[in-house]
Amino acid sequence: MRLKFVAISMLIAAALPGLPKVVGAVPAYTIEQAVAVAQERNPDILIARKKVVGTHGGFIEARSGFLPSLTSSGLYDKRQTQSETNLRQEDYNAILRLDQNLYTGGAVTSQVAIARLNIDKANYELQEIASRVTMDVRIAFNELLLNRAKVHVREESVRVLDEELKNQQEQLSAGIVGKLNVQRAEVALANERPELFNAQTELKNSYLRLAELFGSDVRPGAQAAPFEISGQLQYRPSHPDLNNCLARADASRPVIKARQKDIEIEDRQYVLDRSASRPHVRAFSGYEAYSERDPAVGPEFNYGGVVGINATWNIFDGFATKGRMQATRARREAAVEALAAARRSVASEVRSAFFDLEQAERVLESETKNVQTADEALEMAKGNFAAGLGTQLDVLQAASDVTRTRTTRLSAIYLHNVALARLAHACASSAEVLDFGSDIKNVNNKNGSAARALDVAKPPEKLSQR
């Protein structure tokens, strides 16, 4: 029975690949799962969604101008007895009234149009925020991968240097080397430990940044983050076209569409302001019950239906309407300038991300060759030292160069992935459209196109061969 239950559980897990793996007591997210979690929990996105809901309420309010309104009102008062009068002391009335707008000078139509435009604008702003959060999550995720890889590199480097120190101490005891070699090994190890501590601190900060994007609370005194991530820092070549990116950004970026809606809103607001200078006509009907104070006119209690038309027209309002229209025209001109500024800003974002991507490509090409050169230099230094033609200082310096070049290559891969994330956000495009391999796949993938950065950043097993 237990084996059957285990088999069923494995089938369910295989049928749900989108669910995060559980490492220990915390979930382990891939980068796509991290983006999905942020889309669901990020505070900025939640606030933007509430604003969208609020605009729907504004639309319902504006639409009410097309519908009849039903109101009831009543009055009761009792006056002090007056001398030389036969009027009744009590006065009361109650009415149930139905009102319907017949003509508002375009006010109701404009209010409904503005409400619809506000809904569209809020949705575009939500899309912009969601895109920005996606970019931030991708950057934070890659930063965490980078810092985790740096920790591994520094740990391996400390381990190798520690073994070298022990080796030199043993050789000193055997009388093979002098004390200077031991001191150099001690200095090299002492210099490397702060780099490890710094990498560990940066890794903790990366977890905090990603937790903030997730909207997760980190408990005071917690030694570990409430989640874990899976994958390795990888480089995937991508060569998008700048002109295509600029065209896509100008046509699809939500912030540009939101600024366009601002202009349309001000156009409708101008019609709404102008409606105050036109007549407004309302029809009404209802049923009324009221008292007659004068006994000579009729009985005290009266009731009956009422129907009529009410029209108002502000002939002169002290130029209030003119002032509102002037202010609306100024806001529209400002909205046009804001749209132009948004287009320039988006184009600048695209170009900046594109240039960063090109720079990262060049740095990666250079550092890949540099890593190979540093590896060869280390092997030569080790060979010379073993043959008695070199010094231990040459080996330590070569090992330091290898660690530094491989760490630099890790940083270049991170900058490449960051530039791709920024470019995807700037173009309002998905990762697939930009050929951005955002999914951190297995190292031994079928086509072998993804290069595992940690493999080329791993320090040598040993420094000395003697």
Predicted ranges, named:
Residues A7-G18:
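Bacterial N-terminal signal peptides
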Residues V22-V23, Q80, T408-R466:
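Acidic, low-complexity, intrinsically disordered peripheral segments
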Residues L46-K50, I60-L67, T71, R88, ...:
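Sec/SRP-type N-terminal targeting helices
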Residues T71-L75, R97-D99, R282-G286, T312:
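Transmembrane beta-strands of outer-membrane beta-barrel proteins
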Residues Y76-Q80, L102, Y287-S291, I315, ...:
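Transmembrane beta-strands of outer-membrane beta-barrel pores
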Residues Y92-L98, C245, G305-A311:
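Hydrophobic, lipid-facing positions within transmembrane beta-strands of outer-membrane proteins
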Residues I129-R248, D356, A360-V363, M380-G383, ...:
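Periplasmic alpha-helical coiled-coil/stalk elements that build and connect Gram-negative outer-membrane
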Residues L172-I176, F385-L389, A426, S430:
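A short glycine-centered flexible hinge/capping loop motif at secondary-structure junctions
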